[in-house]
């Protein structure tokens, strides 16, 4: 699937996660997600690939709110939202191909504004390494449907440090486009080996 529905575009969570429901009905067993995110970890630089090991959900609406879908339990366990075997496989492939990767916790927020310096600092103190405006709702619904998940973020901008850095959508897209071949190489090889 290319692209996604974003909550900040005015879609509700049922709309945002509908493609995942369709994928479940089609029988997929593994979901690969990617996104562009702002890095808050001091060891990150623009263009880094961050393998998502966990997430923090800061969206104002939960994708499982309301009547429970029969695809999963009312209260799904999220202790391993991102499959550790897939993370290990990605690490192995990245090492083989000399592709540097980072690991971290992704925070999903509503958007559409980029974060203020104070928000970056707060999110980092809460345990996030990167922040973006997608991914978390889709991952929650995938896990509710017993679909394994692998996630990767392209660090497209940096925030939360002593010097505030302005960011534009164009710069984010430019950084994402530059990192895309490395990300694609890892994911393509993962699919071959899965």
Segments the model singles out, each with a brief description of its role:
Residues 1-78:
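Metabolite-binding pocket within alpha/beta catalytic cores that recognizes anionic/polar moieties
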Residues 92-129, 194:
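Active-site/ligand-binding-proximal alpha/beta "capping" segment
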Residues 22-30, 43, 124-126, 140-148:
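Alpha-helix C-terminal capping segments
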